[in-house]
Amino acid sequence: MDRIICVVGPTASGKTKLAVQLAKLYDGEVVSCDSMQIYKHMDIGTAKPTKEEMEGVAHHLIDMVEPGEDFSAGKYVQLADSCVQDILSRGRTAVIAGGTGLYVDSLIAGRSFAPVPQTGRREALETQLRENGGEAMLARLRSIDPEAAARLHPADEKRIVRALEVYEETGKTITQHNLETQAIPPRYRPVWLGLDYSDRAVLYRRIDLRVDKMLEDGLLDEIRALLALGVSPKATAMQAIGYKEFFGYLNGACTLDEAAALCKQRSRNYAKRQLTWFRRNPDIHWLRLMGTEDFSEVLSAARQNIPFSAF
């Protein structure tokens, strides 16, 4: 088993706090596995750990990319794998923490991704999408890769375009590409720890309180500052939960209470999707929390599932 600990679970479950304490105990460094904390200038809405919360523990893959830039799972795997290799080479523990399931699974599996398309290919497909619509593009994908098409809806425009460009670029369907990469043995053998709450209402309450705290901490000013920097509301980073829900309020289309309620609901729905994703992994040791226990109890329960020694 590699000296790697993966701390996963839904949003607002306490992953950051546990990861920091485990890193301190096991001479580790934290590798963020959050698709939005990778962006600069987006601190409050992505719940980035503060310097105080980091407690002197080195954190990687936070504040790496400008919010107007595109970022992908493939790029994440390249950066994160380099971080993990460096940490392990120094005899330390890599604590991978976050809730972006595709990222962490791809990193641990050592999954390769289809190559970036040639210049102009994606733009051509996006033009065809605008001219013909999602239904027509999905029908085209169905004739090439019926399995991939069956998993998509006409509104899944980015995924339809991606599936088509993979086929045009490689001559292989995205389904075939995924099957080939899944057949490769995992790159790493980590300890998996998952955080969840026995009473779902406790998790939802934590999510609601987090949104309230974000607003108190200046989330609206953060969004205004991003827009002032010229970041498009349609940019991938700005489509994150915690940002796009407040565009309506800033444009005068709804009240702040309505925007906050929408953000809370979407965050709860996201938490459900995260749990569904991670529960497919039989290697995760789940820590079922009540929400009333002392953190030392959570840490003790986590340590019982870690086979290597602390420092």
Predicted regions and their residues:
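Phosphate/pyrophosphate-binding catalytic cores of soluble transferases and nucleic-acid-acting enzymes
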Residues: M1-F311
